[in-house]
Amino acid sequence: NSESKYDKKISASAFTDYVSCSLKFFFGKIAGLAEPKDLPDEIGPHTVGTMLHTVMESFYRDSIGKEVTADYIRQREKLLPAMSKAAMIQELKLNPDYEYLQSALQQIIIKVIEQYALKVLRHDEQIAPFIIKELEDREAYTPLFSIEVEGREEQVRLMGIIDRVDIHQNKTRIVDYKTGKDQLRYGDFEGLFDEEAKGQNKALLQTLFY
């Protein structure tokens, strides 16, 4: 089957791994050696980021294809505590049917996710109205991309799972939620693809990938 060899796809994060450290890409994507997950009593940046993505998808899920106004956002902000709690339960694999007394750490997690989500929504309020086109679409962006390997043409399947695609003032925007402190500037274009360069801008690489 000619399509079967393209079942494995290169995502934006895999692409940035390859550019920043080809050895890390080999161990993770070729050799299949996954990075250790956060310990149960430790909440790492990746876990926080995943929970924020879950909350934002829940917040806008019913708005796909519709115009989102600032009033609509403000009215739904009261749902953030419940959405943040649900995201934590899902990510930490807690029992959703058990009304447990939340630990101090769990309360802090919920509050942190709320604050991250509010920061996104405050920005959304300022630019509203806009129309949500897609959220976390896992099927729409999987094109074949031609590359040259040892003098011959090969193809790889790319995969882009974009957090949000919306339309604002007749322009299509790609929105990628971040919980870290990503740089908005870069030096030279070639330096973005040099794994020995200092301070590689992974957020910009992902944007170019999309």
Short names for language-model regions:
Residues 1-58, 155:
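C-terminal, charged and often intrinsically disordered regions of DNA end-processing helicases
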Residues 3-14, 31-42, 63-74, 92-107, ...:
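Glycine- and acidic
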Residues 7-11, 19-20, 41, 45-49, ...:
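Active-site-proximal structural scaffolding
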Residues 24, 33, 58, 62, ...:
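Short loop/turn segments at secondary-structure transitions that flank enzyme active sites
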Residues 51, 59-62, 174, 206-210:
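C-terminal substrate/ligand-recognition segments
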Residues 54-145:
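A non-catalytic, helix-rich entry segment at domain boundaries
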Residues 134-208:
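Non-catalytic protein-protein interaction segments used by genome-maintenance enzymes to assemble
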